[in-house]
C-alpha cells in the first residue's frame, strides 16, 4: 500500500534524572523518560512510550489502547494504566494546531530509512528460524513494511514492534517472519516510506555451499590413490632392504 503525503506530527517528552552526580549537573547514573509521545494526523495514530536508559520498557498505542511491554517479563514487576498514555497523546492532539502555527507551517524533512535483514540464529536447512527486518533512521514514524517470499506477500506469523526512539530523534522498528530455511525459497523485506523514491527491497536467501564438480572429485580421488600407491611401494622397498641387510653375515 503506497503512502500518501500529508502529516501533522506532535511530540512530547518528559525526562527524569536519577542520582545526579553534582548540583546542576546534566549527567546522571540513570535516566527515565515518559516519552517520546506523539500524535500524527496521518491515519490518526499515536504512541506513548516509557524508556529507561534509552531502552524502551513499554508503549501505549492509540489504536490498541493498551500497554505493550517490550518484554513480557517487564509486566511481572510493574504496572501501567494505559489511560495515562492515552491522555498524553490526547493532549498533543489538542495542541496540534498551535504547534503547526508556531512552526510557521514548515515541513519536516523526510529521512530515508536504513534496512537490514538477518536471521535470529544460525541457519540450518529444515530447522525453524526467524528472519528479522531491522528498519532504522525512520522519520516521520509512518512506514509500511512487508515480507515477500519468492515475490509473494507473506502475512502468516508476522510480528512487529512499536517505534523505538533513537538519540538523534529518529525511530527504529523491527519486523519478524518465522520461516523454515529451504534452498528454493528467497525472501525480501519491502519498505515504503516518504523518504524513499520507490519501495526499498532488502534481499535474503540461504547460501548453500556448492559441492566440487565431478572433475574435481575425480582429481581428489586420483591424488589419494596415487599417494596410497607411493606409500605402499616405499613400504615394500623398506621391508625388502631390511630383510637383505639382516641376512648379510657380519
UniProtKB/Swiss-Prot annotation:
Organism (species): Homo sapiens
Transmembrane segments: 218-240
UniProt topology in membrane: Single-pass type I membrane protein
Subcellular location, record wording: Endosome membrane; Lysosome membrane
Protein name: HLA class II histocompatibility antigen, DO alpha chain
Main localisation: membrane
Region of interest (Alpha-2), ranges: 111-204
Entries under Pfam families matching the protein: C1-set, MHC_II_alpha
Amino acid at each position: 500500500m503506497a503512502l500518501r503525503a500529508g502529516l501533522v506530527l506532535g511530540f512530547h517528552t518528559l525526562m527524569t534524572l536519577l542520582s545526579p552526580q553534582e548540583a546542576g549537573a546534566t549527567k546522571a547514573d540513570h535516566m527515565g523518560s515518559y516519552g517520546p509521545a506523539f500524535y500524527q494526523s496521518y491515519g490518526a495514530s499515536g504512541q506513548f512510550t516509557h524508556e529507561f536508559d534509552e531502552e524502551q520498557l513499554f508503549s501505549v498505542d492509540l489504536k490498541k489502547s493498551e500497554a505493550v511491554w517490550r518484554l513480557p517479563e517487564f509486566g511481572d514487576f510493574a504496572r501501567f494504566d494505559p489511560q495515562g498514555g492515552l491522555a498524553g497523546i490526547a493532549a498533543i492532539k489538542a495542541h496540534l494546531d498551535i504547534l503547526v502555527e508556531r512552526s510557521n507551517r514548515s515541513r519536516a524533512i523526510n529521512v530515508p530509512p536504513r534496512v537490514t535483514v538477518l536471521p535470529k540464529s544460525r541457519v540450518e536447512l529444515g530447522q525453524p528460524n526467524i528472519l528479522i527486518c531491522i528498519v532504522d533512521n525512520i522519520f516521520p514514524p509512518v512506514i509500511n513494511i512487508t515480507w515477500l517470499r519468492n515475490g509473494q506477500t507473506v502475512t502468516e506469523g508476522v510480528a512487529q514492534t512499536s517505534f523505538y526512539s533513537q538519540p538523534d530523534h529518529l525511530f527504529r522498528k523491527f519486523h519478524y517472519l518465522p520461516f523454515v530455511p529451504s534452498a528454493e525459497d528467497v525472501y525480501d523485506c519491502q519498505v515504503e516510506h516518504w523518504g524513499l523514491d520507490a519501495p526499498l527491497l532488502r534481499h535474503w536467501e540461504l547460501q548453500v555451499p556448492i559441492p566440487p564438480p565431478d572433475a574435481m572429485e575425480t582429481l581428489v580421488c586420483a591424488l589419494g590413490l596415487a599417494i596410497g600407491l607411493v606409500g605402499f611401494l616405499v613400504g615394500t622397498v623398506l621391508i625388502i632392504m631390511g630383510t637383505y641387510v639382516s641376512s648379510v653375515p657380519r
